[in-house]
Structure formats: C-alpha cells, structure tokens
C-alpha cells in the first residue's frame, strides 16, 4: 500500500504563462491510495479539492478517480488491461461530469495490438462557443464516446535506438448538440513512427518501478 498527499495552488495560470514566480496560496490538496496485492494487480483511488481553478468561472472543483490494472508478462510478451473512472464536481454546475476509460494491450514480439474505449461528459457550450462566464449560459452537457483499435510493429534497431511503426482508427459518437459540427459518427485515423533512445543498464520506468531491458536489448 502506498499513500500520496500533495498541497498546491489550485488556480490555473492566466495569459501571462511565464509569471510563475507568484504561485499563490497553497489552497488546494489531493490524495491518492495505491494497493498492489501481487505482481499482476494494481488498484488506486484518488480525490482532490481545487480552490477556484478557473479565473472566469466561479466556485471550486472536486475530482475523484478510481482505477484497476491487470498485467501478465513473460519474456517479450505481455497482456495489460486498465479501467479508469473519474468524476468532477463543480460548484457552479448543475450535475457531475463523468469519464470512463478502458484499455487493453497485447504484445507478442515484434507485434503489439491495442484497443481503447472512452466515454467523457463534455461541456458542449465550450465547443459550440455559446458558453458565457460567471456560471451562466452553459449548454446542456453531453457524452462523447470513442472506440480505438490499433497495431504496432517493432523494426530493426538502429544504433541502439528502438524503432516501431503503427497506426490506429477511432470511431466516435457525439451528442446531438454537436452533430451539426462533427457529424453523428466522426472517424479519425493516424499513422506514427516511434523512436526510443537506447536503454541504460538500469532499464526503463514501468508502472512506477524500474524495468530491466529485455534480452534483445542487453
């Protein structure tokens, strides 16, 4: 079990991004509890209080998250599953804002396949440009849903650098308020090239701990 606690200034930076010398009062806090019963499972719960984070919106924000992860691995193969839930409660809002995230990854060297499901409540007024400040004029909240499926393949190393190429496709479902802008079923895709610097003898960080290099990297 691990417990984390932090105290900080909750206000977001204004348009003067470099004016960071005046951090403001330590008026906000967050705490997180981790529980890892064995090498396969990890659980966490967190809660935070943000004192007036937005200068143009009244009130405070309370945020809560919970997640569970499962991992099994052997040599150059692994399977990982993660589910995360989050909720934001704004003083000036009429309801909670929820988010759900589920991801699965399967590696069977040199291939990786992955999928991701996301459902997020959004303030549609921000996207429509109809939101006014001081807590009025907010459009009805809506939920954006996205499903992503992708794959990646490792390439031969180049001077110790790890290369991989991959791509994925995402299908979205948007609330009725946003259909006129984004369509009812927006689809996006991307291709990417991944580059990793050579692994040191200490290995990489994974799940908050050091992971030794795989055999082909030593």
Where are these regions (language model features)?
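Outer-membrane beta-barrel "beta-signal"
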Residues: 149, 183-218
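Outer-membrane beta-barrel translocator/channel fold
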Residues: 47-56, 78-101, 112-147
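Outer-membrane beta-barrel translocator domains and adjoining extracellular loop/strand segments
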Residues: 15-22, 50-61, 92-99, 125-132, ...
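Loop-centered beta-sheet repeat module
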Residues: 2-54, 58
């Amino acid at each position: 079990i691990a417990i984390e606690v932090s105290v900080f200034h909750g206000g977001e930076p204004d348009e003067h991004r470099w004016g960071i010398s005046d951090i403001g009062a330590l008026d906000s806090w967050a705490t997180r509890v981790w529980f890892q019963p064995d090498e396969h499972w990890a659980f966490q719960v967190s809660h935070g209080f943000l004192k007036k984070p937005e200068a143009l919106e009244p009130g405070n924000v309370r945020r809560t998250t919970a997640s569970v992860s499962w991992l099994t691995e052997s040599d150059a193969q692994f399977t990982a599953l993660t589910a995360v839930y989050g909720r934001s409660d704004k003083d000036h809002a009429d309801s909670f804002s929820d988010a759900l995230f589920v991801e699965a990854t399967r590696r069977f060297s040199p291939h990786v396949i992955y999928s991701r499901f996301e459902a997020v409540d959004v303030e549609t007024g921000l996207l429509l440009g109809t939101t006014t400040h001081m807590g009025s004029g907010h459009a009805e909240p809506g939920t954006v849903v996205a499903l992503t499926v992708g794959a990646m393949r490792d390439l031969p190393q180049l001077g110790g650098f790890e290369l991989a190429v991959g791509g994925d496709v995402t299908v979205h479902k948007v609330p009725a308020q946003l259909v006129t802008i984004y369509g009812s079923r927006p689809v996006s895709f991307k291709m990417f090239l991944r580059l990793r610097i050579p692994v040191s003898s200490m290995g990489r960080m994974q799940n908050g701990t050091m992971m030794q290099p795989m055999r082909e990297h030593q």
